[in-house]
């Protein structure tokens, strides 16, 4: 009986400790999915960047709001989740399906969906750990404004092939940045 009580106490302490930590451990597969998504996104390119120079635009990716050195790990998970969700919304739209190879688009969206599940699992572990700090809200707002600018750009360009190519390249940079953020967070943990 004493062993059972001791075992239960250890489980409770371990559960409490992991819940109260500054975040969660994303599965190793998250990084693999992110790399695969980047590779597929690169394969989706249909036009050369030179042919779309006239359509290039700086969407103002909020790197300073997503950078691991600026926000803590617990704050970065909701921001990365929102970034991934916005990318999925963009590429899962009916306007997107006409622009890309269906097989590559499905693969890309599936990778994003699996990444969202991983990030959502982290968020569930963080429930109750801390309130949404102002910096996190600023970061989430910056990500949403960034994607609003992308959506407006696509609408203004009538979802042209060059507009989608510009957006594809921009999203590739955003996903690369999110991979770098997670890499720095993992280094800090080690």
Swiss-Prot record:
Keywords for the protein's UniProt record, in alphabetical order: Antiviral defense, Cytokine, Disulfide bond, Glycoprotein, Secreted, Signal
PANTHER family per record: INTERFERON ALPHA-5, TYPE I INTERFERON
Main localisation: secreted
Post-translational modification: N-glycosylated.
Localization terms from the record: Secreted
Positions annotated with a glycan in the UniProt record: 101
A GO cellular component annotation in the UniProt record: extracellular space
Entry function: Has antiviral and antiproliferative activities. Produced by macrophages and stimulates the production of two enzymes: a protein kinase and an oligoadenylate synthetase. During viral infection, mediates antiviral effect, either directly by inducing interferon-stimulated genes, either indirectly through stimulation of natural killer cells enabling them to control viral replication.
GO molecular function: cytokine activity; cytokine receptor binding
Signal peptide location: 1-23
Family: Belongs to the alpha/beta interferon family.
Disulfide bonds: 24-122, 52-162
Entry superkingdom: Eukaryota
GO process annotations (BP): defense response to virus; natural killer cell activation; negative regulation of cell population proliferation
Cross-referenced InterPro entries: 4_helix_cytokine-like_core, Interferon_alpha/beta/delta
The name this protein goes by in its record: Interferon alpha-11
């Amino acid at each position: 009986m004493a062993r059972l009580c001791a075992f239960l106490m250890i489980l409770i302490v371990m559960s409490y400790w992991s819940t109260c930590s500054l975040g969660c451990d994303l599965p190793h597969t998250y990084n693999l999915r992110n790399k695969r998504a980047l590779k597929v996104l690169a394969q989706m390119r249909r036009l050369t960047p030179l042919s779309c120079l006239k359509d290039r635009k700086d969407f103002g990716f909020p790197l300073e709001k997503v950078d691991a050195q600026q926000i803590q790990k617990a704050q970065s998970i909701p921001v990365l989740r929102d970034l991934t969700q916005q990318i999925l919304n963009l590429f899962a739209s009916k306007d997107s399906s006409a622009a890309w190879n269906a097989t590559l688009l499905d693969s890309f969206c599936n990778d994003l969906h699996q990444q969202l599940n991983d990030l959502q699992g982290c968020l569930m572990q963080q429930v109750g750990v801390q309130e949404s700090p102002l910096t996190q809200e600023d970061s989430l707002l910056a990500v949403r404004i960034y994607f609003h600018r992308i959506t407006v750009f696509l609408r203004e360009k009538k979802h042209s092939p060059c507009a989608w190519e510009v957006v594809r390249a921009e999203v590739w940079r955003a996903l690369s940045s999110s991979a770098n953020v997670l890499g720095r967070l993992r280094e800090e943990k080690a």
